[in-house]
C-alpha cells in the first residue's frame, strides 16, 4: 500500500501542475494605472504561484500580479506559456512603496527565495518559461540587478554562477484570473504544499523583519 500511496500522490501532484492548462483571458498591464510614487519591479523566478505568494507577504508591497513577460507574442495564455509554445516566462509584477521597501530589498528577496543558478528550470518545473530573469524599468534598476548578481557570484553562496537574465522591461501580460492569489485560494493543492510553502518559509526565515503583520503568525 505504501508504494501505491506514493504513486497516487505523484499522479495527483502532476495533475495539479497541469490542471490549469486551459485557455483564458490575459490583459496587458498599463503601468500608468498605478499611483504616483509607486515603484514597479518585474521578476521571473519559476512558477508564478510561488513568487506571487512570496512578495505578497513583504511589507511595503501593495500589489503583486502573476503574468507573462519577456516574449514577443501578444495575448499569451497559460496553455501556451506553460507548454513552452511562446518565448514568454511566467513572471510577477510588483507594485511597492519605495518609502517602506526598497528595490534593492526586493532584489535580495528575489535572489534568496529561488535558485538563480538553474538554467531554464526551477525545482520540478522545466523549460525556458520557468527561467530566472529580472526586467529593469530604469537604468538604476539595471545597475542594481547587475551589482547584486556580481556580489552573489563573488560570495561563493552558490557553486555555479548566477544565470539570471537581465533585460529591459517591455510588456507584461496579466495571467488569467484563476492564477491571481492562487496560493491563498488553493492551500490544499499538492504543488502549493510541496513547492510553494517551503519557498514562503524561506522568506520568513531570511527576512523576518520584512513580513507584513497579518502574515507573521502564519504557519
Language-model features, listed with the residues they occupy:
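Bacterial N-terminal signal peptides
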Residues: 2-18
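Flexible coil/turn and secondary-structure edge motifs
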Residues: 15, 19-219
Amino acid at each position: 500500500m505504501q508504494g501505491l500511496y506514493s504513486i497516487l500522490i505523484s499522479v495527483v501532484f502532476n495533475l495539479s501542475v497541469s490542471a490549469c492548462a486551459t485557455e483564458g483571458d490575459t490583459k496587458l498591464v498599463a503601468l500608468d494605472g498605478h499611483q504616483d510614487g509607486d515603484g514597479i519591479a518585474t521578476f521571473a523566478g519559476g512558477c508564478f504561484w510561488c513568487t506571487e505568494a512570496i512578495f505578497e507577504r513583504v511589507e511595503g508591497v501593495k500589489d503583486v500580479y502573476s503574468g507573462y513577460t519577456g516574449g514577443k507574442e501578444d495575448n499569451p495564455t497559460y496553455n501556451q506559456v506553460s507548454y513552452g509554445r511562446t518565448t514568454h516566462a511566467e513572471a510577477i509584477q510588483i507594485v511597492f512603496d519605495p518609502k517602506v521597501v526598497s528595490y534593492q530589498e526586493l532584489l535580495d528577496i528575489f535572489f534568496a527565495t529561488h535558485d538563480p543558478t538553474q538554467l531554464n528550470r526551477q525545482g520540478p518545473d522545466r523549460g525556458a518559461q520557468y527561467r530566472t530573469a529580472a526586467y529593469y524599468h530604469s537604468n538604476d534598476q539595471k545597475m542594481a540587478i547587475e551589482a547584486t548578481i556580481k556580489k552573489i557570484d563573488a560570495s561563493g553562496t552558490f557553486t555555479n554562477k548566477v544565470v539570471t537574465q537581465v533585460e529591459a522591461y517591455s510588456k507584461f501580460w496579466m495571467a488569467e484570473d484563476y492564477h491571481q492569489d492562487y496560493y491563498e485560494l488553493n492551500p490544499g493543492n499538492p504543488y502549493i504544499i510541496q513547492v510553494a510553502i517551503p519557498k514562503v518559509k524561506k522568506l520568513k526565515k531570511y527576512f523576518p523583519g520584512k513580513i507584513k503583520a497579518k502574515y507573521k503568525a502564519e504557519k
